């Protein structure tokens, strides 16, 4: 996909010129000039869009097309309005099978041109994204391949930043959408190594089962033991500032989750290929950071395995010893994500991080609580919470803070081990899962993102969303600016 900027939009810049106008129908100077050349055509078309979101087409204007969209009152044109208008424009361009367009929308009053450009590109890229498919016969596809923006105040630097973000999001989506017979733990490791070969600032180590065992990662090994696919611990570094403490992102990389012996229902089990979306987001963020050349140190740690059923699979009631030395009674084999994360979070201690954020499709309970709008997050660190909230607001990648009170820890008591891996009832499931993880994070500042509701869209049109890559990139940009 090609994105660009122009200071002099015209009908001939691309196949279609898109013009956003406010309800007063006042035209910017360039549009007035075009209107004069076309004997008042634009003003006539504007009369046909009386309500916000209304559109009108005019084809065959000097061999090109013109789309007018009404943006409402100037004083009411907000970030939400922008998102709606960009969505309507993108869907219209795709429906009309345009391969290129020049988009001229009004500036937001309260936001920078850089921010507005990023939001428009992220929105367009999200809607034009096409699933990787394995069909032997393909219908003729027609993709929107080029969008040029006229946005006073936007710079080439801001354009390159926006392109880096959507590249990271696309990489995340491509990985998450890959079928589980291809995207195995080994494949994830290969993708991480590939990043280290693409960028000089990235290095990578992929650790196999023998060394995982030597390090005492009994929880990760327990989850993996039911599958013929060996587990992988991926340790990938972006070296942007050798003098600063690293930020660590820990990703859950369960490339397929049957639930183990606590087997999931058949309905929608195919979507459990998305259980590695946390890992995919970590790799997407690292790729974007390399493109952005952020002056930070960033480490991605991914614990990857398959959770399957076999004669060697872990059983309900088994007790395992984690890398931290703490023991866990496995009450529910379908609460496997927190097990692999426990060892990965302990592994993170060796790097003396500034802070750690884990990203995981961890619980169905978070979907019940928040649906697919906001990512649930938990932390005891108020400064980190403020940073996450700020990044979420700026990136429009929504979050909602859930409690992490000490009283919830009681649900994890075991008569046989230091803890159980899941509560005996379903109450407060997302919170007790985070409480479990908190027991492995006492040596650093930590936050947990439960992306089970936001990482993918379910159903017939199932598709990875690429969230929370925009949120995390914005957070890391703040870290970079503070150093």
Swiss-Prot record:
Can you state which reaction this protein catalyses? Release of an N-terminal amino acid, Xaa-|-Yaa-, in which Xaa is preferably Leu, but may be other amino acids including Pro although not Arg or Lys, and Yaa may be Pro. Amino acid amides and methyl esters are also readily hydrolyzed, but rates on arylamides are exceedingly low; Release of an N-terminal amino acid, preferentially leucine, but not glutamic or aspartic acids
Provide the active-site residues from the annotation. Answer: 264, 338
Q: Which InterPro entries match?
A: Leucine_aapep/pepB, Macro_dom-like, Peptidase_M17_C, Peptidase_M17_leu_NH2_pept, Peptidase_M17_N
- Which compartments is it annotated to reside in? Cytoplasm
Q: What class of enzyme is it?
A: hydrolase
- For the ligand (Mn(2+) 1), the binding residues are 257, 334, 336
Among CDD domains, the record links this protein to: Peptidase_M17 (cd00433)
Query: For this protein, what is the EC number?
Result: 3.4.11.1, 3.4.11.10
- A Gene Ontology cellular-component term: cytoplasm
Report the principal subcellular site: cytoplasm
- Which amino acids does the record list as binding Mn(2+) 2? 252, 257, 275, 336
GO annotations under biological process?
A: proteolysis
UniProtKB keywords = Aminopeptidase, Cytoplasm, Hydrolase, Manganese, Metal-binding, Protease
According to the lineage, what is the superkingdom? Bacteria
Question: What does the record note about the cofactor?
Answer: Binds 2 manganese ions per subunit.
Query: Pfam families, per this entry?
Result: Peptidase_M17 (PF00883), Peptidase_M17_N (PF02789)
What cofactor does this chain's UniProt record say it requires? Mn(2+)
* One GO MF term attached to the UniProt entry: metalloaminopeptidase activity
What Gene3D superfamilies does this protein's entry cite?
Leucine Aminopeptidase, subunit E, domain 1, Zn peptidases
Q: Which NCBIfam families match?
A: PRK00913.1-4 (NF002074)
Q: Which family does it belong to?
A: Belongs to the peptidase M17 family.
What the protein does comes down to: Presumably involved in the processing and regular turnover of intracellular proteins. Catalyzes the removal of unsubstituted N-terminal amino acids from various peptides.
Q: Which PANTHER family match?
A: CYTOSOL AMINOPEPTIDASE, LEUCINE AMINOPEPTIDASE-RELATED
UniProt name for this protein: Probable cytosol aminopeptidase
Which species does this protein come from? Legionella pneumophila (strain Paris)
